[in-house]
Regions:
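N-terminal export leaders
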Residues: 2-7
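N-terminal segment immediately downstream of the Sec signal-peptide cleavage site
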Residues: 20-50
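Hydrophobic helical h-region of N-terminal Sec-dependent signal peptides
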Residues: 8-12
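Glycine-rich, aromatic-bearing surface loops/beta-hairpins
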Residues: 149-235
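Structured domain cores in non-transmembrane regions
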Residues: 38-155
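C-terminal motif of bacterial Sec signal peptides marking the signal peptidase cleavage site
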Residues: 16-17
Length: 235
C-alpha cells in the first residue's frame, strides 16, 4: 500500500495526469453505546476519495483524500468522547484508519495501491449500514477525552471497551459505517475553539526534547497534533 503523502511527493507530472480511475464514498460514522442500559448514538459525516495513480516514479499506485472531522460522542450528560479519524495501534505511531477500514468494511480485499476496476465499482455502488471492520481485527479509531475541554493538555486516550471505567454506567456497543449523501459534519472547531488557530503541536503534552521517548513508548497524548482531529482534506 502506498501512502498518499509519498505518492504526492513523487508525482512530477501535474495532478490531473497522475490520477486515473477514482471513487468517492460519503459515509456516516455512527457510534453506539448504552447509558444505564438506555441506547444512545452519535454520528459524523465524512468522505473518502480513492484514486489510482498511473504516472509516478514508482509506477502505478493509489492515493486517498479524507474529508471530515472527529466524531463528537456526547454521553447523555456523563461526558464526551472524541472519536478521531486515526488509529493508535499498540506500540506504534498514529496512522490512517478509515481509508483502510472502508475497504475491508465493504469487502474489498485489495489495498489502496492495487485497487481494480471492480473495486472502484464496489466503492461507487456502496450502500446501507455496515459494522466497521479494519482488516480482520477488532481495532477501532482512537477514542479520546479531556479532563477539561478548554485545556488540550488534559487529553487522554480511552480503550473503547473501558468506557464505563471513565464514565460510570456507559458501555460502548458498536461503530458502524452508513453510506449517505448528507453534508459533511462541521462542528468540531466550534466545540473545541482552540482548534481554530492551533498549529502548534506543543499545545498537547510533550516529553522534554532531551529525554523524548520513542513513539513505541509514547501515549497518544504525547504524539497527537491538532491536525489529527481532521481528515487530510479538512485541515
Amino acid at each position: 500500500m502506498k501512502r498518499r503523502s509519498l505518492l504526492a511527493s513523487l508525482c512530477v507530472l501535474p495532478l490531473a495526469s497522475c490520477q486515473g480511475e477514482s471513487a468517492t464514498v460519503r459515509f456516516k460514522v455512527i457510534a453506539s453505546a448504552t447509558v444505564n442500559g438506555r441506547p444512545i448514538e452519535s454520528s459524523s459525516v465524512m468522505e473518502i476519495t480513492y484514486s489510482k495513480v498511473t504516472h509516478s516514479l514508482l509506477g502505478t499506485g493509489g492515493a486517498t483524500r479524507l474529508c471530515g472531522e472527529a466524531l463528537i460522542f456526547d454521553l447523555d450528560g456523563r461526558g464526551t468522547v472524541y472519536i478521531l479519524p486515526v488509529q493508535h495501534p499498540p506500540e506504534s505511531s498514529l496512522s490512517q484508519v478509515y481509508e483502510y477500514g472502508m475497504l475491508t468494511t465493504l469487502g474489498v480485499k485489495n489495498g489502496i495501491g492495487s485497487l481494480t476496476e471492480q473495486d472502484f465499482a464496489t466503492l461507487r455502488g456502496a450502500n446501507g449500514r455496515h459494522s466497521f471492520r479494519l482488516y480482520g481485527t477488532a481495532r477501532l479509531p482512537s477514542f479520546v477525552a479531556f479532563n477539561d475541554e478548554r485545556d488540550p493538555k488534559t487529553i487522554f486516550e480511552i480503550p473503547p471497551p473501558e468506557l464505563d471505567r471513565y464514565f460510570p454506567g456507559v458501555r460502548f456497543k458498536s461503530l458502524d459505517i452508513q453510506i449517505t449523501n448528507e453534508p459533511l459534519t462541521e462542528k468540531l472547531r466550534e466545540r473545541l475553539p482552540w482548534l481554530k488557530n492551533a498549529n502548534d503541536p506543543n499545545i498537547f503534552p510533550r516529553d522534554p526534547r532531551a529525554t523524548r521517548r520513542p513513539n513505541s513508548e509514547l501515549p497518544l497524548s504525547h504524539m497527537i497534533t491538532p491536525a489529527r482531529f481532521f481528515g487530510d482534506g479538512s485541515r
